[in-house]
From Swiss-Prot:
GO terms for cellular component: nucleoplasm; nucleus. GO terms for molecular function: metal ion binding; protein serine/threonine phosphatase activity. This is Serine/threonine-protein phosphatase 7. Belongs to the PPP phosphatase family. PP-7 subfamily. Mn(2+) 2 binds at D113, N145, H197, H303. Its main location: nucleus. The active site is at H146 (proton donor). Its cofactor is Mn(2+). Expressed in leaves, and, to a lower extent, in stems and flowers. Residues 404-413 have a biased composition (Polar residues). It comes from Arabidopsis thaliana.
Length: 413
């Protein structure tokens, strides 16, 4: 790594990013991770440049639908699907180099969880935003459960941003939260592959108005029994309100929480995800029903690393960065996890030493997954954790719901 410091990043005249600008940003972040204390990041990426990048990306993301249909693939030879990254910047940079950077014949779909746990969540997210701005129809960024106020306050991202940007940290953090709200929830690739961070979702409960007068009108939601829950539809997914800081676990807007937090199970049917306190568990029959109804071949989700899978019965481990969880008549359900040697700050003997992985879907039908596992980049720069990794809840279990912000108020700048 060069010891000569790079020049500070400036926003290009006219605001149009170039390939060289994005590569310069990546090089700048990699250099700073080795050579500067975190609090010096603004010397390379001034707040005004951060603001311009996030504002430009925010406008693009908020125009995308809840489920983006990626169909303009005539010139694309492959689509790369990436799982959780969790602030492991150097592994992301390796993955991009190993696979090939986004270009007109190579499309990327990132399945969420860009931040938290790892030490470079901000840099990771900004690298991905810069690629999105440069190539909006070749890079798709979906939301993960960690792109939320609750998770980022518990698993390190908020503290990371405040450490790096000091008295401007609250401003930077709020801008990131606003951008998180704009991230789409899911994608459908070439009409054959559905991707989302957590996975499937239930049909929402419709409110029942139970009063006579307008002044005293109340809305009552009757929560269904697990046996009466129905698998949701893509139309219902499109109509969900995604612009919330923390997806609700109750009420009529359950789809965002389901899509971000749910997990597969080997038990048939839908049931509450009691271990997480939000979202669903769905069985192989639900996978088959969803694939068959929409003539899909694959569901690709993320959300579970080696720590989560250690506790799951009947499902494969995450040693190689991926598992095939359901193999049904119409196709497959796959979990992909792209953060190797996870989690970063655990003592060596307590880390899982897992590989990360990504999936390549090749033309013409993009439905035959090729799995590519990779080792963590070593050595990593020295860094301090931004969360209490020894005592914090594992794998997002047993959530403190009182700490979640489930309204749809935009964060102030």
């Amino acid at each position: 790594m060069e010891t000569v410091p790079p020049s500070p990043i400036t926003w290009p005249d006219g605001g149009a990013l170039t390939n060289d600008w994005v590569h310069g940003l990546m090089s700048c972040f990699e250099w700073s991770s080795w050579n500067l204390p975190p609090s010096q990041l603004p010397s390379l990426l001034p707040v005004n440049v951060f603001d311009s990048l996030v504002l430009t990306a925010h406008k693009i993301l908020h125009k995308e639908r809840n489920c983006v249909h990626i169909d303009d693939l005539d010139s694309v030879s492959n689509v790369v699907v990436v799982g959780d990254i969790h602030g492991q910047l150097h592994d992301l940079l390796f993955l991009l180099k190993d696979t090939g950077f986004p270009c007109q014949n190579r499309c990327y779909v990132f399945n969420g969880d860009y931040v938290d746990r790892g030490a470079w969540g901000l840099e990771t997210f900004l690298v991905l935003l810069s690629w999105k701005v440069l190539m909006p129809d070749r890079v798709y960024l979906l939301r993960g459960n960690h792109e939320s106020k609750y998770c980022t306050s518990m698993y390190g991202f908020e503290k990371e941003v405040l450490t790096k940007y000091g008295d401007k940290g609250k401003h930077v953090y709020r801008k990131c939260l606003g951008c998180f709200e704009g991230l789409p929830l899911a994608s459908i690739i070439s009409g054959r592959v559905y991707t989302a961070h957590g996975g499937l979702f239930r049909s929402p409960v419709l409110p029942k108005r139970t009063t006579r007068g307008k002044k005293n009108r109340r809305v009552v939601l009757l929560e269904p029994e697990p046996s009466s829950m129905k698998l949701g539809t893509l139309d219902e997914l499109m109509q969900a309100r995604r612009s919330v800081l923390d997806p609700p676990w109750e009420g009529s807007n359950l789809i965002p929480g389901d899509v971000l937090w749910s997990d597969p199970s080997m038990t048939p049917g839908l049931s509450p995800n009691e271990q997480r306190g939000i979202g669903l568990l769905w069985g192989p029959d639900c996978t088959e029903d969803f694939l068959k109804k929409y003539e899909l071949k694959l569901i690709i989700r993320s959300h579970e690393g080696p720590d989560a899978r250690e506790k799951r019965t009947g499902l494969g481990g995450m040693d190689n960065g991926y598992t095939i969880d359901h193999n049904v008549e119409s196709g497959k359900l796959i979990t992909i996890f792209s953060a190797p040697d996870y989690p970063q700050f655990q003592a060596t003997e307590e880390r899982y030493k897992n590989k990360g992985a990504y999936i390549i879907l090749q033309a013409p039908d993009f439905s035959d997954p090729q799995f590519h596992s990779f080792e963590a980049v070593k050595p990593r720069p020295k860094a301090h954790p931004y969360y209490d990794f020894e005592n914090v809840i594992d794998s997002d279990d047993e959530m403190d719901k009182s700490a979640m912000d489930t309204n749809n108020e935009q964060p102030n700048s």
